[in-house]
């Protein structure tokens, strides 16, 4: 049993998670992390840094709920980057889903978002968060319509895609330049768990032919262009920027 849990009645669900995402194989290959399940859902801990606390996915309460209600709607930089300010509600393929925060913002604004995640633990956390969101009275109906997960490498999945999404969204892991004490706990855990996306440059080559309207790449403000390709336009925030590679106009 990879996932630790005090509730026997939860074991069938946890066995399903372990099988679906190959967590036993991951546990055999990895050390320094532990997975726990309780009434708040699935959580990841870095065992040698307990003060960092738990990493989990919660779309229903907390920061996600606050951003959904008060985050600025279609005026947000990410919304402009995918073309929501044009009056469209595009189908977005989030090829580097992570914990799904950006995908959730877009789904809450009406986009249909397909999440790709290749790391088994991250995918399991994301899947668990989605199940709880699907069952929520308030957001469940539109979450079931607007947000779905496919587990696997985006390089493989993009090559297999038969239908063209309007937008392919990329947010590859990039080494953080700040001192470790200043980096968010989540980023520190992720960098140890997943590492940098050393094959990220290749993603743009897969993504561009697949997107019917545009590719959007989220980058730290100090990071170079992905694959050294100059974007059609940029939308900048305080710490990040969205490099937008436009192929065709958005239609309402």
From Swiss-Prot:
Coiled-coil stretches noted in the UniProt entry, renumbered to this chain: none
InterPro entries tied to this protein: 16SrRNA_methylTrfase_J, SAM-dependent_MTases_sf
Organism this protein belongs to: Pseudoalteromonas translucida (strain TAC 125)
HAMAP family: 16SrRNA_methyltr_J
Identification of the protein by name: Ribosomal RNA small subunit methyltransferase J
Reactions catalysed according to its record: guanosine(1516) in 16S rRNA + S-adenosyl-L-methionine = N(2)-methylguanosine(1516) in 16S rRNA + S-adenosyl-L-homocysteine + H(+)
Keywords, ordered alphabetically: Cytoplasm, Methyltransferase, rRNA processing, S-adenosyl-L-methionine, Transferase
GO molecular function terms listed in the Swiss-Prot or TrEMBL record: rRNA (guanine-N2-)-methyltransferase activity
Subcellular localization(s) per the UniProt record: Cytoplasm
Broad class of enzyme this protein falls into: transferase
Keyword Amino-acid biosynthesis: no
